[in-house]
Design a protein with these regions (language model features):
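Transmembrane-helix signature of polytopic, membrane-embedded enzymes
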Residues: 25, 112-131
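Transmembrane alpha-helices of multi-pass, membrane-embedded glycan-processing enzymes
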Residues: 86-90, 99-110, 149, 322
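Short hydrophobic/aromatic helix or loop-helix immediately within or flanking a transmembrane segment
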Residues: 54-62, 71-94
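Alpha-helical transmembrane segments and terminal signal-anchor/GPI-anchor hydrophobic tails
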Residues: 54-57, 64, 69, 83, ...
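Membrane-interface transmembrane helices that cradle and orient dolichyl/undecaprenyl
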Residues: 150-164
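Membrane-interface alpha helices of multi-pass inner-membrane proteins
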Residues: 133, 164-187
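Transmembrane helical bundles and short interhelical boundary loops of multi-pass, membrane-embedded
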Residues: 293, 343-377
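Short acidic/glycine- and proline-prone juxtamembrane loop motifs at membrane-interface regions
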Residues: 138-144
Length: 377
């Protein structure tokens, strides 16, 4: 755990070397240092780091030695895009470690760029990602890679380029079909340039309650697209008493969501710049995207507890909304309602509580990443 404790402290360690990270240049260097370290850790990990890492290596070796056809004869059925990616890499590189290098560089670059472009507190956002997302990225690497493609496509939403967004999502689904859930988000660019608070609230609520009402249809679609997931929905369920659906976390996510909506549109009304939260102050497309992810996080614990443990995979997507929204809500609330001394206390309490929580998450080792080892060991 000492190794991962240092990883959790990286946002604070690198912060010591900068007098300020509000400056765009310092912010870029700061985030580059953090995510370069995360890239190295993720890409050089050994076969025992991550529950699915060994299976990724086996798939690579099978396709490298016998071609894609041999993989299907072996009775498996991964997405074509993923298999083609492996085939191309295996024609150039013999060692399967290159697959993790590619996964890591794309995943960490996408997250680094997202935090740089849309977060008003890069230190807190980086810490939240390391706490909630980094360990997962060394296990669900294929899904993280597909979602990274989605994150890199956010500019298409900003520019209201409907066709490019649809093509991007369809491309990502050839790596992991779960990214198909982002196809309906293509309607966001159809919003007015100056959307208001009520409109955004309606969109987020429709997305939230629509996901509940259409749950059965969604499950049937998933089973149709990926038959091997049948057992997850009809053969494996959590009980309603699990901590995954605790009222505390659901209420906390809801509070973050609605505070973010409220504070963002207060900024709009007073014509105050929302730091680097969005590229253009009055373009609501990126903020609605992250609000929808946060809304998805609100409903995710319910799905995990009462439908299927498979919905834990939704967290790969939805928690990115929290990386952006939590720092935004805390910073804006502190600036608006608290004195300087009170702000310091709030930040200290936040980092202490979430630091303990982060240590607990890693200690539980739900992704099989402890102990860490390099691939040459």
């Amino acid at each position: 755990m000492l190794f991962y404790s240092i990883v959790l402290l990286m946002p604070f360690i690198f912060r010591v070397f900068f007098s300020s990270i509000k400056d765009e240049k310092n912010k870029k260097i700061y985030l580059t240092c953090i995510f370069m370290c995360l890239f190295i850790i993720s890409s050089l990990r050994g076969e025992s780091v991550g529950i699915d890492t060994a299976s990724y290596r086996e798939t690579y070796c099978l396709i490298r030695d016998y071609g894609i056809g041999a993989y299907y004869r072996d009775g498996e059925s991964y997405e074509y895009g993923y298999l083609i990616l492996i085939w191309i890499l295996s024609r150039i590189f013999h060692d399967p470690q290159i697959l993790f290098v590619v996964f890591s560089v794309v995943t960490n670059y996408a997250m680094c760029k997202t935090i740089y472009k849309y977060s008003n507190d890069p230190m807190m956002a980086s810490f939240l990602y390391i706490m909630w997302g980094f360990a997962s990225s060394m296990n669900t690497s294929r899904q993280q890679f597909a979602f990274a493609i989605i994150l890199l496509g956010i500019p298409f939403l900003e520019k209201k380029n409907f066709l490019k967004w649809v093509l991007l999502v369809l491309g990502a689904t050839t790596v992991h079909k779960s990214t198909l859930v982002f196809l309906p988000i293509a309607v966001i660019p159809l919003l007015r340039k100056k959307s208001d608070e009520f409109e955004t609230m309606i969109i987020v609520l429709i997305g939230f309650f629509g996901s509940i009402l259409l749950l059965d249809h969604f499950i049937n679609l998933v089973i149709y697209l990926v038959p091997r997931y049948y057992k997850h929905f009809y053969g494996q369920r959590y009980g309603g008493g699990t901590g995954e659906a605790s009222l505390f976390w659901i209420m906390l996510y809801f509070l973050i969501l609605f505070m973010a909506i409220r504070l963002f549109y207060i900024d709009i009304r007073i014509r105050a710049k929302a730091s680097s939260f969005i590229v253009e102050e009055r373009d609501s497309t990126p903020v609605v995207f992250f609000m929808l992810l946060t809304a998805l996080q609100c409903v995710q614990p319910f799905f995990v507890a009462y439908v299927s443990s498979l919905f834990t995979r939704i967290g790969v997507f939805s928690r990115v909304g929290l990386y952006i929204m939590i720092p935004y809500v805390i910073k804006k609330s502190c600036d608006k309602y608290f004195t300087n001394d009170s702000r310091r206390i709030i930040y200290i309490v936040f980092y202490l509580l979430f630091g303990i929580f982060a240590f607990h998450i890693y200690q539980q080792d739900g992704y099989g990443i402890i102990p860490y080892s390099f691939f040459w060991n």
